[in-house]
Amino acid sequence: MTARSEPAVTTALCESVLDEIGRVVVGKRAALNLILITVLARGHALVEDLPGLGKTLIAKSFAAALGLEFTRVQFTPDLLPADLLGSTIYDMQSGRFEFRRGPVFTNLLLGDEINRTPPKTQAALLEAMAEHQVSIDGVTHRLPEPFLVLATDNPIEYEGTYPLPEAQLDRFAIRLELKYLSEAEETTMLRRRLDRGSVAPTVQQVVDV
């Protein structure tokens, strides 16, 4: 999609993307619409909700529908900045120092439970989210374009967590909740699961952003 696209064409493409994602994600249309708007605006989204509400599935579905490379990182207390950004290591065979990219070098990064990692690692994302680059050992490395972060956290669990600082929260264009499905939506989800059997749901690419 480009800025020059006709509004009607852009709207139709957006609806097609949401419809395709809706084949595997039941309900949550309003939340999906907000996430898509954030993606088109090249922003980042923070989803604050309980586990098991489909956050990972939503992120994977958006990546597939939009033709984006997807990477998931589970944020844990022992996660280091180098585990996220990458590091410079010495290659014995070539006799040179080489930079090995971390999982942040992707199009759509799912930061799962971002509030479970210490502030030092949280801060490692600041430059990446704001400037789409990372600086390591005095060298700046550009990230792939587009670069989008979809982060999640559990807002009701505080033990073993580190609240996101204001500087980090400021990098997100939106904060939203997914909330539970309605009774009718839960019934639809169960029927789809029974009809599908053990076959995993798939999302087809609709457009290349």
Task: Describe the function of each predicted region.
Residues L34-I37, Y90-G111:
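Conserved alpha-helical scaffold flanking the Walker A/P-loop in AAA+ ATPase domains
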Residues L50, L84, T152:
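P-loop (Walker A) phosphate-binding loop of NTP-binding proteins
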Residues V39-T76:
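Walker A/P-loop
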Residues P7-L53:
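Pre-Walker A (pre-P-loop) alpha-helix and adjacent loop at the N terminus of AAA/AAA+ ATPase modules
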Residues A45, L109, F147:
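Conserved beta-strand position immediately N-terminal to the Walker
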Residues D49, D112-E113, A124:
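Walker B catalytic acidic pair
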Residues D91-R96, T117-T121, M129-V209:
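Canonical AAA+ ATPase core
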Residues A65-Q93:
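AAA+/P-loop NTPase substrate/partner-engagement loops
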